[in-house]
Amino acid sequence: MNHTVQTFFSPVNSGQPPNYEMLKEEHKVAVLGVPHNPAPPTSTVIHIRSKTSVPHHVVWSLFNTLFMNPCCLGFIAFAYSVKSRDRKMVGNVTGAQAYASTTKCLNIWALILGILMTILLIIIPVLIFQAHR
């Protein structure tokens, strides 16, 4: 019986460098050389904004709509506040800020007119009652 040993792998320390295939990118670098750029490397700065808080004033608008709604300002403010909230959810921050600013102005006017109407509704009957005495 003849026992011959066949090796499928070459020995590790055979004294010859292993035969590797050269990748396409390595071949390009070897042929062209490392790129030399005389200009200094430039950097790009990216400013990432944090989430901007845009108040939409839905609760304030709802309060003005339900309790003090002079000249329908509370209802209009509520419509604008819903638009502001929708723009904020979509990611349109500038549109949301514009609608929020209008909502705030309408809510302030609705509150002022509502308070004045409440005061007048209290004062006028008192004055009329005192005049009839």
Swiss-Prot record:
Coarse class of the protein's main subcellular location: membrane
Membrane topology listed for this record: Multi-pass membrane protein
Keyword Membrane: yes
Transmembrane domains' residue ranges: 58-78, 108-128
Compartment(s) of residence: Membrane
Cross-link for Glycyl lysine isopeptide (Lys-Gly) (interchain with G-Cter in ubiquitin), residue positions: 24, 83, 88, 104
Regions of this protein lying in the Cytoplasmic compartment: 79-107
InterPro entries the record matches: CD225/Dispanin_fam (IPR007593), IFITM_antiviral_protein (IPR051517)
Pfam family, one: CD225
Keyword set includes Transmembrane helix: yes
Alphabetical UniProt keywords: Isopeptide bond, Membrane, Transmembrane, Transmembrane helix, Ubl conjugation
Topological domain spans for side Extracellular: 1-57, 129-133
Family stated for the protein in its record: Belongs to the CD225/Dispanin family.
Official protein name in the record: Putative dispanin subfamily A member 2d
Source organism: Homo sapiens (Human)
